[in-house]
């Protein structure tokens, strides 16, 4: 019996020693607006170190906005994505680098075929993220093939999740998504802005 108690105690000690290794990784978030959140969500998913990408709304004055509120252009909100990532595998600077190549930062009237304030590009930052974002914007502006940088860097605000039917849209509606993306001219314009 005594031997069984010792073995049980040893097993608990081993399990306790490995508990930190089993703990969830520390995560951080980044919030980006870049026109249609379907496209931003799709293009940020699959980046190594990105754990989750969620479509939603931010930057406005209306609490709990709906898609209709946002696209009516009366709420002040942007269509945006919240990217949750593992900072041990991916840094914020790389996410910014990726972001710039997914948007036309020279267009402050919307993005591609989506027009209006809710479709403008913007980076929403915490105080710690601001200097990194500002430096990244300056570097990105030097690489533009056409136009001048107009994308704003704004203070992070409450992020409201979009309605369920907007989330993971590209995965659930592949044909509609790619028809929209192609018809909107997103990829063609990105080649003009960034080259390649």
UniProtKB/Swiss-Prot annotation:
EC number: 1.8.4.11
Residues annotated as catalytic: 36
InterPro entries reported in the protein's UniProt record: Met_Sox_Rdtase_MsrA_dom, Met_Sox_Rdtase_MsrA_sf
Presence of the UniProt keyword RNA-binding in the record: no
Origin: domain of life: Bacteria
A GO MF term: peptide-methionine (S)-S-oxide reductase activity
GO biological process, alphabetically ordered: protein modification process
Gene3D superfamilies xrefs: Peptide methionine sulphoxide reductase MsrA (3.30.1060.10)
Keywords, ordered alphabetically: Oxidoreductase
Catalysed reaction equations from the record: L-methionyl-[protein] + [thioredoxin]-disulfide + H2O = L-methionyl-(S)-S-oxide-[protein] + [thioredoxin]-dithiol; [thioredoxin]-disulfide + L-methionine + H2O = L-methionine (S)-S-oxide + [thioredoxin]-dithiol
Annotated HAMAP family: MsrA (MF_01401)
Protein name per its UniProtKB record: Peptide methionine sulfoxide reductase MsrA 2
Species this chain originates from: Caulobacter vibrioides (strain ATCC 19089 / CIP 103742 / CB 15) (Caulobacter crescentus)
